[in-house]
C-alpha cells in the first residue's frame, strides 16, 4: 500500500511569507495553497507541506532532499537565485559545497530561511 503512495514532505516555518518566497521564488517549486495550517508547494509528483509553527528548533540534520541528475549544475543554478550552500569541514569542494562520498555519490546541503537543512544528491548507479 505505502510503496505505491505519493510521498508528502513536512517542514516547519515561523514565517509563511518568507517560506513561500524561498520555496517558490528561489527553489522554483509550484505553489499549491496557503491556509491557516500550512503552505503547500509541489515538487514533481511530491507535495511539501510547510507547516506554520509558532515555535520550533530546526534540526541539525537533513530533513528533506532532492535527487538530481547533475548536482553541480543544480548548485550553480540555485546560487544564481540566491541560495547559499553549507561548507562543512569534511566537504572537499569548498567553492560549491559539494561532498563526494566514498562510493562516488555527490551531496550538497543548504538551509531554508527557518534553518531547516535541505540537500541535493546525485547518485551513482
Q: Which functions belong to the PLM regions below?
A:
Residues 1-18, 47, 61-64, 121-125:
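N-terminal beta-strand motif that seeds the catalytic metal site of vicinal oxygen chelate
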Residues 10-48, 53-55:
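Core segments of cupin and vicinal oxygen chelate
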Residues 22, 71-77:
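Short amphipathic alpha-helices within nucleic acid-binding modules
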Residues 35-37, 58-59, 93-94, 103-104:
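Short acidic/glycine-enriched loop/turn segments that link adjacent beta-strands
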Residues 45-47, 56-58, 69-73:
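Short, charged/polar surface micro-motifs in flexible loops or helix N-caps
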Residues 53-57, 124-125:
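A short, sequence-level motif marking secondary-structure junctions
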